[in-house]
Regions:
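N-terminal beta-strand motif that seeds the catalytic metal site of vicinal oxygen chelate
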Residues: 1-17, 76, 132-152
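Loop/turn position at the start of each blade in beta-propeller repeats
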Residues: 4, 40, 108-110
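Vicinal oxygen chelate
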Residues: 5-14, 65-152
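Residues embedded in well-ordered beta-strands within globular domains across many folds
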Residues: 7-10, 55, 77, 105, ...
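Core segments of cupin and vicinal oxygen chelate
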Residues: 12-54, 58
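Catalytic cores of nucleotide-enabled group-transfer and carboxylate-activating enzymes in metabolic
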Residues: 18, 22-25, 32-34, 56, ...
């Protein structure tokens, strides 16, 4: 067996309406949920790459994620463009929507902004920097692992 690509992410959420607004309106992800008749309270989103990349399932009354370092998912990354100008535009749109940026990092291979969704899941919004460099040598990502503050 060989994994070909990461297909989708499924998140449990406590408030589907709030999470649906965040991923659909704030992040601009296209919702593809058929509406009624799926048997449970959920919303699916796709960028058009595949049938769905994100599925939100409402689980009311579940415990919130613990804050800080913990086992399990740290964050997931969403590529939002190709240039720092697009990253700046995203930063400004997030600020206008009242979304707090919790980090901004130059990883060498990416420039990244970090935010949290309404349920506390961390999301990396990024652009690739010199994609040919890491495509030719994936190990370059770890050759200089120092994360630097990103100044946009």
């Amino acid at each position: 067996m060989k994994v070909k690509e990461l297909g989708h992410i499924v998140l449990y959420v406590s408030d589907l309406a709030r999470s649906r607004r965040f991923y659909g309106e704030t992040l601009g992800w296209r919702e593809i949920t058929p509406g009624e008749g799926i048997g449970f309270s959920a919303a699916a989103f796709s960028s058009g790459r595949t049938h769905h990349e994100l599925l939100l399932i409402e689980v009311r009354g579940a415990a919130a994620l613990p804050r800080g370092r913990r086992l399990g998912l740290y964050h997931f990354g969403l590529k939002i463009g190709e240039t720092d100008d697009e990253l700046r535009e995203a930063r400004d749109e997030l600020a206008a929507a009242g979304v707090r940026i919790v980090g901004a990092t130059d990883h060498g291979v990416t420039h990244s902004l970090y935010i949290e969704d309404p349920g506390g899941n961390e999301i990396e919004l990024y652009i690739d920097v010199q994609p040919a460099r890491w495509k030719e040598d994936p190990g370059v990502m770890f050759s200089d692992p120092v994360a630097r503050p990103l100044r946009l």
